[in-house]
Amino acid sequence: MTTIKQFLCGATVAGMVAATGAAVGAPAGLSAVTADWLLAAEHVLLIGLDGVNLSKVLEYAYDDDSGFKTAMDQGITGAASLTNHTTLSGPSWSTILTGVWDDKHGVFNNLFRPEPYNQWPTVFNLIEYNKPEVDTTIISNWEYLNQLAGAGGYSVDNNIFVPAGDSPADSDALVTALTIAQILGTEDNPDDISSFLFSYQSQADHAGHSFAGGSEEYMQSIINLGANIQQILAAIAHVQSITGDDWSIILTTDHGHQQTVTLPGLSIGHGFQSPNETSSFVIFDQAGDDANDGSQSLGYSTVDITPTILSLFGIPLRSDFDGVSLVNDPAVLDGIVEPTDLKQSLLDALAMYGYPNIGNDITLAIRTVIGSVPYFLDKFVTEIDTFLQSIVDQDIFLISGLAEVAQQINEFFGGLTVNVTNTVAHGFAYLLGSGVIAPTDAPLPLPGAAEFTGSLESLLAGDTFTAPDIGDLDLSLLLDVDALLG
């Protein structure tokens, strides 16, 4: 038995080879006279690290025991900046995972709304629609990202949410273990199924909010993350030694952190436009590119990540992307340099970033403040609900019943208040430039709207069927090779 994903991939590739003897649609920059690049598994890993200042990585984790340095030594590192864009996690991860800035996708705070991702499909949607044979996975301990990966008509195959646990560090350790298990699972891959894996860790952001980016706690979180990354990279090296499969690896963050506490035990952390908050980075290790190991990019941006992932799978890019592919964009490739001292060169690059003009600075600050009101209201309502639930769970005569009634009242009126304030905040955010640019590309068709009469979603989810022998198929009926060749 085989899955519909495996069959679609095999039939299409076989048809291309049989009819042309060449790889149709090979990615730019790759010369191929066979379809070997299509038949071999291609794996892409995106490691998301919330709230990590590159300057602190270079200070605390630039050593041979850290996965940060290993990744830098094996790839290309770019110091990036989010200047003129909101430095909140929801908007920033949306940019990373859609390839457009917040003036397009319209995400303005950390309360999940599915609507932006219907207009601006995520990397998961675009992979699942264009190449459903690719196995897509998210492993995350922030539920917003799991919701994002499940949004749109073509959601992620494997959506793994990791609970908070006893501490953010413990939760990240579990994310690391699950990520390694997912990687090791590709060792037994007889059907050469390609994969995209997004692994997200959050402890640095928690440390930054509680103790600020200049604290010992933040330092320890960076060291911990370096150790986690090292384990993940070791797992990839192990699998590669057995399978020979190609792995491309990207590391990034959504924003930086303020360096001092706002109040004892509390730091605003980020959301505004100081250089420490707008600090970001991209580390890119492309499979097969050993010539640029240890290099620096002067042009990497977080908005380039989704276009890059798509191009690695040979998927065409949207014309309304703000980002470009780091694989083959001429300007990006021209911006790769080989510094004599990578650490110092990256610090010099970070020092060049400053504040936006005063108008943008004020506008973005107002947008952050307004967008934060419904977010913190939601947290307050949730905390009340959790407290009342603890009383309900004790099953105390009369009191637990009253707590349950109070819980229902809190959920109704609290939820209504959050929804109303979030709608108002959304309107203000739009007036301040969030989501004002509409897509120019056509939306993705609804699942099941064309080729299949059944539920395409259920087929892509892994339902099995008896596949005919490819040698018995009339492949000319499956695809028009002349049309593909233009």
Predicted region positions:
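Metal-dependent active-site segment of extracytoplasmic phospho-/sulfohydrolases and closely related
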Residues: 45-46, 63, 67, 224-268, ...
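Catalytic-site neighborhoods of secreted/periplasmic enzymes
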Residues: 105-110, 115-168
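Active-site rim elements
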Residues: 110-114, 216-219, 268-269, 289-300, ...
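Histidine-centered active-site microenvironments of extracellular/periplasmic hydrolases
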Residues: 252-285, 339-340
